[in-house]
């Protein structure tokens, strides 16, 4: 009877191959990880490397892991593939709304940045770099808040915890990551005086109508740049916000129309004056189309375009905005503050928080109140002061 090889035993040999007439050399180790219980045949695995030393180190590590019972067979599964499996098969006890939020974060953040990495190769340093990058301000987009990054971390941590339980990876690399401290950022809206100066400064500017619509609708930059004419209903006086302009997560990535951050389209009813601004934009675009002639191309039917019908570049819009606000003494103002300006103006005009939440596309009214609660507090104080004056007037009569 032949003697069985012990699990973990292996041999190293030098291998060569020829490609395009040139000979290449590498080292290979084959080792046993045990026997198939069904067939009784030996299960063989292979390790390769550029040098004998590299392969020998890998073989020793695999042998130790086999002896200790911690060995995990190499897998070609990527992080993206595992996230898809996990989100479809391991969230049966999670509310549908939460599952939807998980899938949105996976699609918008985790897969574009980590999806192509082999699951077993994902490490703490890579994940930490990903978290840090999410919190950095870029020219064409706002940084994610510390709270949002923490939520994304929670999803990844949970998915990788299951991968450990399934035996796909030895440990959860998110465990050692350092999350940013959640600091509530002050909003910097344009006040009434700033708004008047801003509107005066953009008169005749190429982006005048774009800036004006953003200021008085509260649309995010990606939403206003991704707005299409089929979503503008002049008869009803409404705007359907269902898309946003995004760039592929790679160097010089192409721009495309994507679904919203929360995958929830919303209908906004702006002031009639804003709809008139959009009519002006339609006329301006028609003039641009005539001037461009055969060079015109607007396949997505975008509302705001360059002179040839193409999409506007987000960082160009932001840079030009910064030049405008600097000229009126507000160099600290960001493009996103146009959204804050709309929200504050709406609340002070008497809109309730629920209405403002719906127009802004926030997930909950509590989030809207958390961001703009100080405005309602100021209004309450002003109301109390008016009532105080009224009471004193009555008592002194």
Region locations from a protein language model:
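N-terminal core-binding DNA-recognition domain of tyrosine site-specific recombinases/integrases
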Residues: 19-24, 72-76, 87-168, 184-186, ...
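Basic/aromatic DNA-contact patch characteristic of tyrosine site-specific recombinases
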Residues: 1-77, 81-89, 103-104, 129-132, ...
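Short, basic (Lys/Arg/His-rich) helix/loop patches that form interaction surfaces
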Residues: 138-142, 200-207, 217, 268, ...
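C-terminal secondary-structure termini that scaffold catalytic or DNA-interacting sites
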Residues: 2, 200, 236, 247-249, ...
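Basic, Lys/Arg- and aromatic-enriched nucleic-acid-binding interface segment
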Residues: 142-146, 150-152, 165, 169-229, ...
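Short, polar N-cap/turn motifs at the start of nucleic acid-interacting alpha helices
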Residues: 231-238, 331-332, 351-373, 381
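C-terminal catalytic core of Y-nucleophile DNA break-rejoin enzymes
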Residues: 45, 52, 238-240, 258-280, ...
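Catalytic-site neighborhood detector that most strongly recognizes the C-terminal catalytic loop/helix
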Residues: 181, 185, 189, 245, ...
């Amino acid at each position: 009877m032949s003697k069985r090889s012990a699990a973990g035993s292996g041999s190293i040999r030098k291998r060569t191959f020829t490609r395009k007439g040139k000979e290449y050399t590498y080292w290979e180790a084959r080792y046993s990880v045990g026997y198939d219980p069904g067939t009784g045949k030996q299960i063989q695995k292979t390790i390769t490397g550029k040098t004998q030393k590299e392969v020998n180190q890998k073989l020793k590590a695999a042998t130790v892991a086999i002896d200790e019972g911690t060995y995990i067979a190499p897998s070609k599964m990527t992080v993206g593939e595992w996230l898809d499996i996990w989100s479809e098969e391991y969230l049966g006890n999670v509310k549908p709304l939460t599952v939807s939020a998980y899938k949105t974060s996976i699609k918008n953040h985790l897969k574009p940045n980590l999806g192509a990495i082999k699951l077993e190769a994902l490490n703490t340093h890579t994940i930490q770099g990903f978290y840090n990058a999410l919190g950095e301000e870029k020219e064409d987009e706002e940084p994610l808040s510390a709270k949002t990054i923490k939520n994304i971390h929670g999803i990844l941590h949970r998915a990788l915890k299951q991968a450990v339980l399934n035996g796909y990876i030895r440990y959860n690399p998110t465990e050692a990551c350092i999350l940013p401290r959640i600091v509530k950022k002050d909003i910097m809206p344009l006040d009434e005086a700033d708004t008047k100066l801003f509107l005066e400064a953009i008169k005749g500017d190429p982006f005048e109508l774009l800036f004006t619509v953003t200021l008085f609708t509260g649309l995010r930059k990606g939403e206003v740049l991704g707005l299409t004419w089929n979503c503008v209903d002049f008869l009803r006086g409404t705007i359907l916000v269902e898309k946003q302009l995004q760039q592929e997560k790679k160097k010089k990535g192409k721009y495309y129309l994507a679904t919203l951050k929360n995958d929830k389209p919303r209908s906004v009813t702006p002031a009639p004056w804003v709809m008139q601004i959009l009519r002006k934009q339609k006329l301006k675009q028609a003039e641009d189309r005539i001037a461009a002639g055969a060079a015109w191309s607007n396949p997505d039917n975008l509302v705001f375009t360059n002179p040839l019908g193409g999409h506007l570049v987000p960082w160009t819009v932001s840079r030009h905005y910064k030049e405008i606000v600097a000229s009126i003494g507000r160099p600290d103002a960001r493009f996103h503050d146009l959204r804050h300006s709309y929200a504050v103006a709406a609340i002070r005009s008497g809109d309730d928080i629920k209405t403002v939440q719906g127009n802004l596309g926030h997930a909950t009214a509590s989030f809207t109140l958390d961001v703009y609660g100080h405005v309602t507090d100021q209004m309450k104080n002003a109301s109390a002061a008016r009532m105080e004056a009224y009471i004193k007037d009555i008592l002194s009569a």
